[in-house]
Amino acid sequence: MIFVVKKILDFLVFIFTKEKLLLYSKQTKKIDCLIISHLINTNHLIEKNDFYFGSLQSRLSTYKLSSLIALRNFTGKNLRTLSKLPFDKKHYKVVLSSFFKINVEIKIILLFLNEFFRIKILKNKYDKNFSLLKKIGKIKYLKSIFSNIRISEQVIFLIKLHKPKYLFFTYEGHAWERIVIKKVKEFFPKIIIIAYQFSIVTKYHHSMFRPLNKIYNPDIIMTSGSITADLFKRKKLDKTSKILIYGSDKFTSKAHYNLPEKSILILPEGFCNETNILFNFCILASTYLPDFKFYFRLHPLIKKNDFIKKNCIQKIPDNLIISNNTLEKDFENSKYAIYRGSATIIEAVNFGLIPIYYSQKNEISFNPLFKFEKKPFKIQNIKDLNNTLKINFKHEKLRKIRGYCRSFFQQPNSGIIKSLFKKK
């Protein structure tokens, strides 16, 4: 129960330091649209476009619709620290605190304890060796109760404060999304709930495509392209939610075919273990292939200084570079892209790079391009990589994979936004 004690102590510190509940870029009252997004890097505070929703706020303002983006704070910094940083002043933004009102936090702790002991009793009553109960009874699987309940309470609080007619949020299949949908439908049934599927799907993606009782399903699902729109329809989700192809600001209009020959971009996800897997492989590859340049691009969730300290960067080969470039510049510098579960591979392929999926033995695939998961686009070791790099890839060989990626992130369609608000 150390985790619960730590949570209580953190909350007491939060109270006594009089930490803010909300941090606004600029104050606003009544709005048309509330957008729930995520702050994963402090640099994103000054960006005009949101990291997940892109230019949605600007597109809404084109139709004279006011909006507020509420950012869940994953930077590791409190609101007092963030308040000293520059904000984009063009759009309304609010950063949510990692804690909320006292009564809410007490309720969450009680819910957590109730669930923890309920599962303990079930384990003792039925079967101590029942693997599912053993798993979900572990603290690490119950920790999400705190953030899931808190975000639902914060959303309800913001709705009461700003009285929006529409609620947008990112849609990946997380539990908090369904909890928010249910609460909003219960307390504010007239609000139109719009879930935005913005990222990749894998072969084993399930929760996002799982149709539940109507009260847990969004009114509208906006997708990044026709690939996922078709998946939602195939899973019969169009019976409970309207499916619309909105597109994505990650869309690239033109592929580039004259990229540097001996250059490879590495695209890890925003998890430390995944970053380390690709970094270790990259060290081996750059040592074995000294004629190639390797550009290792950290995900915004990974703090570069911390990563450098932990990985003794001074010992890496000279042809391995930890990139500080913009994403587009990294694309321009590279012909190939090695990845695992990163959504950025879709953008890389659309730009003109050749995708190479690095798979470890006996693991479940989480390849966003799983339909093309075979050699030469899939490797498991340096020998495989070397063989792939020797291939003269012609346009015809890449045509299908590029067509798939172009249908995954399509050009944003403002007409979809216009049609939504016309009907209200």
Language model: regions and residue ranges:
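Catalytic-core helical/loop segments in enzymes performing group transfer/polymerization on anionic/lipid-linked
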Residues: 1-424
